Amino acid sequence: MRIAIDIMGGDFAPKMNIEGAILAAKELENVKLILVGDETHAKPFLKENLPNIQLLHTSEIITAHDDPVSSVRRKKNSSLVIAGKLIREGKADAMVSAGNTGALVAMGILIIGRVQGFERPALAQLIPTYDGNDVLVLDLGANIDAKPENLIQYAKMGSIYVNKMKGVTNPRIGLLNVGTEKGKGNELVRTTYNMLLKEELNFVGNVEARDVLKGHCDVIICDAFSGNILLKSFEGVIETFFSLFKKQVNKNLITKVATLALLPTLRSFKKKMDYREFGGAPLLGIKGVCIKSHGSSNSTAIKNAINQAQKLVANNYINFIK
């Protein structure tokens, strides 16, 4: 198995990408990792000579400020584009990038190609729920201006994903909305609701944002605008919770001592809700395994994203969705 890593993408590139790849290479000894990027920037961080790591030099970088579509077409020797070409040419089985989301989606469509029957790809993420399981939420950032037909396709992609990757039979599909009643929401969600009723899917109705983590659904679909706000709200709430908790703990000796008993539970909870532990968001609907990592990913997040890519390839997900 071969996994390409766009080492020039993300806020802390290439350092964190390379360090994450080294961590993954030690865990996945039978997987070849192809580090795609500028060798001048990369070599100072390649301090270990591992047999399953290869550096592939590229001379261009797609930045966070570049226009997604034009940069993919113009910067043909960028790390992101070359990583995508490796998949298209059968030289890599998967790729990981923490770079420009729009460019990643454009690359997925223009270079790797869409799966027949799916008009638009979607970024998906498994989010922990109260009952200890996960809910797959999509789209989280690939297609801001979605149509009802796109959301129906997301439901089908998500259903296949949780069935094949998690073994969930007849996955429950929910539609993110401002209320649970039929007829709630804007035209997009109302039309999608009525269309879902006619599909051979286990559609359980509308789901409000406050109920996403309650485990009532296996898959929740939404447009990328709503999904991205939902995901970043979760991240912000968790970060704020622990910041406020830390301030309260340090108020006096009693709270400090009491907190010692809670530390194992708090650490476990924080780890479970930490986006760095999730790995990344697979771009579903394209003809290859492509994982989008958080832009501010550290080495642990990159390592977990690579592990996630390896599992998707090992489980033959692409052939199932085709």
Model-derived features with residue positions:
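N-terminal glycine-rich anion-binding loop in soluble enzyme alpha/beta folds
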Residues: 13-66
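Short glycine/serine/threonine-rich phosphate/pyrophosphate-binding segments
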Residues: 13-18, 76-84, 88-90, 94-108, ...
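Extreme N-terminal starter segment of soluble prokaryotic enzymes
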Residues: 1-4
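Short beta-strand segments
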Residues: 6, 35-36, 56, 97-99, ...
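Glycine-rich phosphate/nucleotide-binding loop
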Residues: 109-123, 129-133, 137, 216-220, ...
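Phosphate/nucleotide-donor binding subsite
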Residues: 50-92
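Glycine-rich phosphate/diphosphate-binding loop of Rossmann-like nucleotide-binding domains
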Residues: 13-15, 28, 32-34, 39-40, ...
